């Protein structure tokens, strides 16, 4: 029995040592490609979830890069099968920016692909590409906190603050750890990182299983894929919408809706 206990202790120490080295390699930055599935946990679908659902973006692939200062994401919905992202996000400790120009381009292309003549009626995008969380909140008629994702940058890859856990939907052969933040609020985000045990021994990118809950936004996200240690240089987008563009964007959205109704009626 004593030998068995010693073996277990040694195995646990080795595993934690491997995790320690792996976490340190990710602390400076990483790149990743992950399949994702987002579900709503709120009684009423949250604003951001509704936007994604309208474009079939609640499941698909997310490619991105991470540094301790910022996070950059590209979303590729499973339903579209397009080589172009639905939208891009830039998340720093100070703000969340959404690529509204890319989202509009995706919408316009999906319409003109089915109704080529609609391209004459639907104008091209002629504003700054990125919309801020405050501008998006104003457009959606919600509070600023509903469009802010800065909490995604609060998770700390600090070995002293990482707790070993075993989630209900754990995958076989994975070690799971909960990353903590300094936010003690009841609705603070919770991130559980699962790393394939065999991947801890490899120099290449390990397979991961990530569970992310953001109670403040009423969403749960499950991600699977690979993460690679990297040292990317992320800079905030310079092509940004002005506050005065919001009225133009509202008018543009109304134009698109009117054109879609017209071409669908003409085609029926």
Task: Describe each model-derived feature in a short phrase.
Residues 2-268:
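Subset-of-secretome marker
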């Amino acid at each position: 029995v004593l030998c068995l206990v010693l073996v277990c202790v040694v195995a646990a120490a080795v595993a934690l040592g491997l995790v320690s080295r792996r976490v340190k390699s990710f602390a400076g930055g990483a790149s990743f490609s992950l399949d994702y599935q987002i579900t709503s946990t709120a009684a009423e679908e949250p604003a951001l979830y509704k936007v994604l659902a309208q474009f079939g973006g609640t499941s698909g692939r997310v490619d991105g890069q991470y540094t301790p200062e910022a996070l950059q994401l590209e979303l590729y919905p499973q339903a579209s099968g397009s080589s172009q992202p639905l939208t891009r996000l830039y998340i720093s400790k100070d703000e969340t920016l959404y690529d509204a120009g890319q989202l509009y381009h995706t919408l316009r292309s999906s319409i003109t692909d089915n109704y080529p003549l609609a391209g004459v009626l639907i104008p091209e995008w002629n504003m700054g590409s990125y919309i801020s969380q405050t501008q998006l909140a104003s457009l959606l008629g919600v509070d600023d906190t509903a469009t802010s994702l800065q909490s995604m940058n609060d998770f700390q890859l600090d070995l002293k603050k990482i707790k070993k856990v075993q989630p209900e939907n754990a995958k076989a052969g994975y070690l799971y750890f909960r990353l903590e933040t300094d936010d003690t609020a009841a609705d603070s985000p919770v991130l559980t990182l699962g790393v394939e045990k065999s991947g801890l021994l490899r120099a290449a990118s390990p397979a991961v299983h990530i569970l992310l809950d953001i109670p403040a936004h009423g969403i749960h996200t499950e991600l699977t894929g690979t993460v690679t240690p990297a040292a990317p240089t992320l800079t905030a987008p310079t092509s940004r919408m002005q506050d005065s563009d919001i009225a133009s964007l509202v008018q543009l959205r109304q134009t698109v809706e009117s054109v879609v109704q017209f071409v669908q009626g003409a085609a029926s």
